[in-house]
Design a protein with these regions (language model features):
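Conserved helicase ATPase core of P-loop NTP-dependent helicases/translocases
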Residues: 74, 282-286, 291-334
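Conserved pre-motif I regulatory segment
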Residues: 2-34
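Conserved interdomain linker/interface between the two RecA-like ATPase lobes of SF2 helicase motors
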Residues: 155-280
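Conserved two-lobed SF2 helicase motor
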Residues: 84-106, 319-334
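Post-DEXD/H (motif II) to motif III coupling segment of the RecA-like Helicase ATP-binding lobe
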Residues: 117-173
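Conserved helix-turn-beta segment of the N-terminal RecA-like "Helicase ATP-binding" lobe
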Residues: 56, 60-63, 70-91
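Walker A/P-loop
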Residues: 30-50
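Conserved RecA-like ASCE P-loop NTPase motor core of nucleic-acid helicases/translocases
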Residues: 60-69, 282-289
Length: 335
């Protein structure tokens, strides 16, 4: 453990000092690494400082920033412009950028855990870069695909929420677990049973199951059929049908479970009851989708459906209020 890290464990330090430690760790990793840092610890500022340092030694350095949403794209462009760093710096949305072959000196990936997905990982393959900086609060993915990012930009430093709270960089908070009993739990159990049967067919291998749907799925199902029943074409055809059936069942049941949990009306009912007894507070709710955010009876709604001007006005009005609610979805979470 470095001396800087030891000091940070025993005595409070400023956020600026900790960010300087992160930058040194990134430089020590030859400028090819990912920074894992809790929300509110200044990941964007770390990136800005790195761009500034590189531009100081090489004013013509070309930087590309990849972000998951247009909202973050706008925020990055605004902040880069305010800091005088927009020259020779481009900000692209990951999905669109994945279809192009770019070349740059420094590649910055915000919400870097996303770039390991099957589609977005093309950004890592297609982009030529000298340095790479990944920024994320959650490096590891449940599907294990974070190993893809780790090949290009392994973790060089981590700022945990515990460290941020200890040093007073973020506001203290409490987590409350609200257990919700739903009358139609049998429906969820049915979805779960179907999911487990399909998952078991693929030997509880998530990557294997996911490879049977989407891109190259036809080829992957045939290869799996030949692996399970080699040297018998007729049996392979029957196995292919079974694989297709269980792959479809796997995806369908997984989506059904997700929708059940995310959109259950009981969640809305309980949330509105909690809000009702806190009408003197300022409350922000985050929903999984726009429909759920719009289902709340009172308060402002902030989603991607409205134009940029309307969203800005909504945030400005909410920020001026002494109390009230702002209902949003992933757009505000990432903003």
């Amino acid at each position: 453990m470095s001396q800087d890290k030891q000091l940070s464990l025993f005595a409070p330090i400023s956020r600026d000092e900790r960010q300087a430690q992160v930058i040194r760790a990134w430089a020590k990793a030859n400028g090819r690494a990912t920074v894992v840092a809790a929300t509110g610890t200044g990941k964007t500022r770390i990136a800005m400082l790195i761009i500034d340092k590189l531009k100081y030694s090489n004013p013509t350095i070309h930087t590309i920033v990849l972000v998951p949403t247009t909202t973050l794209q706008e925020q990055w462009i605004t902040e880069l412009d305010q800091r005088g760093l927009l020259l020779n710096t481009e900000v692209f949305v990951m999905m669109g950028a994945s279809k192009h072959n770019y070349k740059c000196d420094l590649l910055i990936i915000d919400e870097a855990h996303r770039v390991s997905s099957e589609v977005l990982s093309a950004n890592l393959v297609n982009t030529q870069f000298r340095y790479i900086l990944g920024l994320t609060a959650t490096f590891e993915r449940l599907d294990g695909r974070h190993e893809i990012l780790a090949k290009y930009a392994p973790v060089c430093d981590t700022i945990t929420m515990e460290e941020a709270l200890f040093n007073g960089w973020v506001t203290k908070y409490k987590d409350y677990v609200v257990v919700i009993d739903v009358p139609d739990i049998d429906t969820y159990n049915s979805y779960n049973s179907e999911f487990n049967k399909a998952y078991e067919f693929f030997n509880w291998d998530f990557d294997k199951a996911m490879s049977m749907v989407g891109k190259d799925s036809f080829k992957n199902r045939w290869e799996y059929a030949k692996e399970l029943v080699p040297n018998n074409y007729e049996h392979q055809k029957e196995m292919f049908k079974s694989i297709t059936y269980y792959a479809t069942s796997f995806m369908r049941s997984m989506q059904n479970r997700k929708k059940f949990v995310q959109n259950h009306p009981k969640k809305l009912e309980v949330a509105q009851e909690i809000i009702k007894w806190r009408n003197d507070k300022k409350i922000v709710t985050f929903s999984a989708n726009v429909k759920m955010a719009e289902s709340f009876k009172n308060g402002y709604v902030y989603t991607g459906k409205e134009g940029k001007k309307k969203n800005r006005i909504t945030l400005e009005e909410f920020s001026k209020m002494p109390n009230g609610c702002l209902h949003s979805c992933k757009m505000a979470i990432e903003g």
